[in-house]
Amino acid sequence: MVLIRVLANLLILQLSYAQKSSELVVGGDECNINEHRSLVAIFNSTGFFCSGTLINQEWVVTAAHCDSNNFKMKFGAHSQKVLNEDEQIRNPKEKFICPNKKNNEVLDKDIMLIKLDSSVSNSEHIAPLSLPSSPPSVGSVCRIMGWGSITPTKVTYPDVPYCANINLLDDAECKPGYPELLPEYRTLCAGIVQGGKDTCGGDSGGPLICNGQFHGIVSYGAHPCGQSLKPGIYTTVFDYNDWIKSIIAGNTAATCPP
């Protein structure tokens, strides 16, 4: 079974496949408190349901399937029970999803750009992550992180974000596990071929960080999480660099690559 990585307590459309319910990092360890300064917690009145990535003081990138009404974003958070002094909360001022996205295909252009209602300040626990300067290389060791489930079957949400290292894999290693993947979906495949480390329910929208740059957005994967031969699927940020930069520059009519 394949699942979109959004919180399990949210309504998930019954499709032939679904995106990961806000998944937690399976097979990881508690993140160092200062290593996830760009990680954004997205929540509403029912609680946390997705993550995002701060790319500058006014903009956040997440997955399009994380779009929801009346959500807020928390910056600088670590423990959900103990506040950091520099935590900041913002509302979305504007949201941008690719105008040429095929709405009936959950994997197509799974990216959303959010303008904040006011800028956030850099601090000990808050800093933006750089957009990629070039495509990532197969074999790269990449970092995943999030407050998603840390167990693959029974949902177990941690108080703090978990992090893990995984490998960027060749598309050919993903195709057998995900025959529905098409080249036009512009995705990356990352994980451990033998399984054991993966994003999971609650991690949707969070970053895949390779060589210190923001290369992927948690989008899609298998359920249970962490299966062998079924790594996670991530939206390729590099392919949307021009769209992101155009929107930020004020060209709100910009379209995404086909």
From Swiss-Prot:
GO cellular component: extracellular region; secretory granule
Localization per record: Secreted
EC nos: 3.4.21.-
Disulfide bond positions: 31-163, 50-66, 98-256, 142-210, 174-189, 200-225
InterPro entries: Peptidase_S1_PA, Peptidase_S1_PA_chymotrypsin, Peptidase_S1A, Trypsin_dom, TRYPSIN_HIS, TRYPSIN_SER
Active site positions, chain numbering: 65 (charge relay system), 110 (charge relay system), 204 (charge relay system)
Keyword annotations of the record: Disulfide bond, Glycoprotein, Hemostasis impairing toxin, Hydrolase, Protease, Secreted, Serine protease, Signal, Toxin, Zymogen
UniProt-listed GO biological process terms: proteolysis
Propeptide: 19-24
Positions annotated with a glycan in the UniProt record: 44
Recorded superkingdom: Eukaryota
Family in the record: Belongs to the peptidase S1 family. Snake venom subfamily.
Protein's job: Snake venom serine protease that may act in the hemostasis system of the prey.
Record-given protein name: Snake venom serine protease 1
Species name: Craspedocephalus gramineus (Bamboo pit viper)
